[in-house]
Amino acid sequence: MRCVVTGAAGFVGSTLVDSLLALGHDVTGIDCFVDYYPRKAKELNLAAAKQNSRFTLIEDNLLTVDITKLLDSAEWIFHQAAQAGVRASWGGYFRSYSDNNVLVTQRLLEH
């Protein structure tokens, strides 16, 4: 199966990527590497997957990426992308949370 995993570099997303690859699926992962967690930690999450020829990583924002190109050939889409840390969502980072948690999900569902 051809799978797309959003939030592929996060803890949950990268674990799912590894599981799908272990089952023999082709996986395209997308992540925008927001700075909530250190980039190095997210890159380590994907270290094993990057060694697999059936894995492709796209570093882009789901709000601006060509969603048709990303999703049209996928048989399964696993949406794991989200801005973590709920407390900060009610402060100065509200826009980031609404964009990355609500608008991105809406865009995927409308496709």
Feature annotation, model-predicted:
Residues 1-111:
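N-terminal Rossmann-like NAD(P)+-binding domain of SDR-like oxidoreductases, especially those catalyzing
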